[in-house]
Structures are given as structure tokens and as C-alpha cells.
Swiss-Prot record:
It comes from the Bacteria. It is found in: Cytoplasm. It comes from Bacteroides thetaiotaomicron (strain ATCC 29148 / DSM 2079 / JCM 5827 / CCUG 10774 / NCTC 10582 / VPI-5482 / E50). The gene is serC. Pfam families: Aminotran_5. This is Phosphoserine aminotransferase. Binds 1 pyridoxal phosphate per subunit.
Length: 355
């Protein structure tokens, strides 16, 4: 039976990316060595990093004056590195969920943090719209997609101060005006690669402005100067990221990824809104294209476990909602085919007929 992978992360990757990574793990570039055992400074590996950086810049149309870094530590490390490198006195944060809240917590150790708005009172089911960003803030931090609650900023915001964005779960799903940001970061295990590598897009002239000492490993300048090679990088995930970037380009680039994301999300939301058994949880104008969250309608709440069992038997994987909110979550990242979305819709319709 075919499995349909809706996991929120680590998540689905294109089949050819998995297969080609597996080949390299056995024999990298005909070297007779596994990708897992070559030196990161081997002559065959530097071109991997160089091409991955070049494709990042090409696919996202990154302007001159920015560096692309491949680091460790996940987005959680960036919650600390961002204020370490950019927060001199004050930073503004938009609180749209758990990950934004965690980023705010780390920033408070480095200076004043202004929460410009929050949707916590509504369990983060919408993204705040009316707020004022302090003009004297060093930066304004946003989390563009909220995987737990299924909300998403689908366009770049306007800000009177430089922006920083956690784009862990929607990078490469839509075009971005990178010039609006001094830093974009994310864990790779949603739309880019297996877990283990963290991407950072950083504006070079924004680094080095704070007065504090920054340990070498936490200083963006260190990694800019060393081309992501200051310490041993996560070789296998970087190689898988390169293969995935090639795949995105071959499929038609970020605009095509956006078209597919809209199509898949529209299909599934239409079924949620039509089906008597299910209710969407996010405000309609803020619904995420990446993480589609829904619950049983109140009068059918007792069928939740039955539907989970039914869907699992039909090959649906990873649709259980986050433990903090419950219900269901279908993550529709770039590599998820439309056929999987249709299979979930068919499953929902079949279950509806039974009840």
C-alpha cells in the first residue's frame, strides 16, 4: 500500500533526492568512499557547498551583499544567534506561536524585547494585523509560517526597521524579497533537506554592529569568512539540500512551487469546509499552505480516534495534530505530490459516508 507522508518535519523529500543521496552514501562521486566518511575539505566536497549557495541565491533572487550559510544547531540555535549578532538595545517581535515565543525568550537575554502583537489569547489561530513597530528597534522578527497552528504570512511585510525571519517551514514555497531582511534562517527539515543543517541568509554589512563580544561559533562573521567551513559542517544534509535545490530548479523554480502549494492547499481546505465532519482551525485569511490544521466538528468529536485509525489504514502518515492543540495536521511541503492530497480528500469523503 502506498504511504502518503504528511509529517510536519522531518518531512517528505523528492524520491530522486533520497535515491541519489543513498547512492552517494555508498560511493560519493566515484571516489570509492561514502559521503559520510569523506573530509569536508576534500576537493570533491567544496563544489557541493559552492553550488548549493549559488542555487540558493539564484532560486530566491538574493541580491549582492548577502551570504548563505550552512550551519548546525537548528532554528533553535538561531533564536540565540540572531540577538547575539543584531540586538544592541531593542528588538521587536511578532508573537504568532510557540516558535516565535521561544525566539523572544532567547532575545530577552540580550536587550529589550518589544512584543508588538500576539494572538496567544486565541490559541494563535490568526496572525495579528494592527500593531506599531518601534522605529528605534534594531530589527523586527517574524515567524512566517506557524506549523503547530496552521497560520502563515504569505507575503513579505513592510517594516520601518530591518526584518529578521524564521522561514523554517515555508522557505522555497513562495518568492521572497530578500532585500527587506537582514537575516532569514531556518531548520532544513521541512522544505529543504533532512534534519541536521540550518540555513542562514545574512546581509553582510548588518553584521559586526553590536558592541558585545560574540564567541566565534556564534558569530555570523566567522561563518561568512570561512564559507560555512569554520568547523566540520553537516556533510550529508548539505549534499541532500543541494540535490533538493536542483530538483526545485528543474521543476520550474519557486514560482512553480508556489503554484503547486496554492493548488494543494485550496483542494484540501475546500474539502474541510465542505465536509460535515471537519472544521478548520485557522482564520481563513491566515490559513497556511504548508500546514493545514483541522479538527472534528463539535458534534462529531467522539469520532477523532476512529478517523485517525481509518486514515492510517488508508496509508496516511503524520496527520495527527501537534500534541499542544490536538486534531489533525496535513503538512503539504514542496515534495508532497498532489496525488497524496487527493488521497487524503478521498479518505475524508469515504469516512463521511460511513457517518
Amino acid at each position: 500500500m502506498k504511504k502518503h507522508n504528511f509529517n510536519a518535519g522531518p518531512s517528505i523529500l523528492p524520491r530522486e533526492v533520497i535515491e541519489d543521496t543513498a547512492k552517494a552514501i555508498l560511493d560519493f562521486n566515484g571516489s570509492g568512499l561514502s559521503l559520510m566518511e569523506i573530509s569536508h575539505r576534500a576537493k570533491d566536497f567544496q563544489p557541493v557547498v559552492d553550488e548549493a549557495e549559488a542555487l540558493f541565491k539564484e532560486l530566491l533572487n538574493i541580491p549582492e551583499g548577502y551570504s548563505v550559510l550552512f550551519l548546525g544547531g537548528g532554528a533553535s540555535m538561531e533564536f540565540c544567534m540572531v540577538p547575539f549578532n543584531f540586538l544592541e538595545k531593542k528588538a521587536a517581535y511578532l508573537n504568532t506561536g510557540v516558535w516565535a515565543k521561544k525566539a523572544m525568550k532567547e532575545a530577552k537575554g540580550f536587550g529589550e524585547v518589544v512584543e508588538v502583537a500576539s494572538s496567544a489569547e486565541a490559541t494563535y489561530t490568526y496572525i495579528p494585523k494592527d500593531y506599531t513597530i518601534p522605529a528605534d528597534a534594531d530589527y523586527f522578527h517574524i515567524t512566517t509560517n506557524n506549523t503547530i497552528y496552521g497560520t502563515e504570512l504569505k507575503e513579505d511585510l513592510n517594516s520601518p526597521v530591518p526584518m529578521v525571519a524564521d522561514m523554517s517551514s515555508d522557505i522555497f514555497s513562495r518568492p521572497i524579497d530578500v532585500s527587506k531582511y537582514i537575516c532569514i534562517y531556518g531548520g532544513a527539515q521541512k522544505n529543504l533537506a533532512p534534519a541536521g543543517v540550518t540555513f542562514v541568509i545574512v546581509k553582510n554589512d548588518a553584521v559586526g554592529k553590536v558592541s558585545r563580544y560574540i564567541p566565534s561559533m556564534l558569530n555570523y562573521q566567522t561563518h561568512i569568512d570561512n564559507g560555512s567551513m569554520f568547523n566540520t559542517p553537516p556533510v550529508v544534509p548539505i549534499y541532500a539540500a543541494l540535490l533538493n535545490l536542483r530538483w526545485i530548479k528543474a521543476q520550474g523554480g519557486v514560482k512553480e512551487m508556489e503554484r503547486r502549494a496554492i493548488e494543494k492547499a485550496d483542494m484540501l481546505y475546500a474539502e474541510i469546509d465542505r465536509n460535515k465532519l471537519f472544521v478548520g482551525t485557522a482564520a481563513k485569511e491566515d490559513r497556511s499552505r504548508m500546514n493545514i490544521c483541522f479538527v472534528m466538528a463539535p458534534e462529531y468529536k467522539d469520532l477523532e480516534a476512529d478517523f485517525m485509525k481509518f486514515a492510517t489504514e488508508k496509508g496516511m502518515v503524520g496527520i495527527k495534530g501537534h500534541r499542544s492543540v490536538g486534531g489533525f495536521r496535513a503538512s503539504c511541503y514542496n515534495a508532497l505530490p498532489k496525488e497524496s492530497v487527493q488521497a487524503l480528500i478521498d479518505c475524508m469523503q469515504e469516512f463521511e459516508k460511513l457517518h
